[in-house]
């Protein structure tokens, strides 16, 4: 028997948390979500990624954002920079037949925990990542 939700998105396996960075691009809904892909309990947060054309049937894509030296990946949002105002994408070069790529930009909170003199300290900062193929992100 399958006990998975029929309408609500759920990851294929392990911990899932808040939805983040939902955006609609060229007929597809992109859903990012806090996710710990290695266990069923809370752990170092990543951003999972799934896409849907109808909000009912979802395809889970590779992990979008991994924890790094700045910390775990917490809440954030996304924007599709269709006009490449940020300059993070590429531009059209018509005489060479090159079509530019607009970036999908993720803005999120990096959460780092350190210990100094036995005391736990937390540092949060805003971070940015972008993708020109809507799957693989550069930080």
Question: Model-predicted segments: where are they?
Answer:
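Beta-rich carbohydrate-recognition and catalytic domains
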Residues: 1-139
């Amino acid at each position: 028997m399958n006990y998975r939700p029929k309408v609500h998105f759920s990851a294929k396996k392990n911990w899932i948390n808040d939805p983040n960075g939902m955006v609609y691009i060229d007929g597809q809904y992109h859903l990012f979500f806090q996710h710990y892909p290695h266990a069923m309990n809370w752990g170092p947060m990543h951003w999972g990624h799934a896409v849907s054309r109808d909000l009912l049937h979802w395809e889970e894509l590779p992990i979008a954002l991994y924890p790094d030296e700045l910390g775990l990946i917490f809440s954030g949002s996304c924007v599709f920079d269709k006009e490449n105002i940020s300059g993070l994408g590429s531009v059209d070069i018509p005489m060479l037949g090159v079509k530019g790529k607009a970036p999908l930009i993720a803005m999120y909170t990096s959460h780092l925990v350190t210990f100094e003199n036995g005391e736990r300290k937390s540092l949060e900062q805003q971070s940015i990542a972008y993708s020109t193929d809507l799957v693989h992100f550069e930080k």
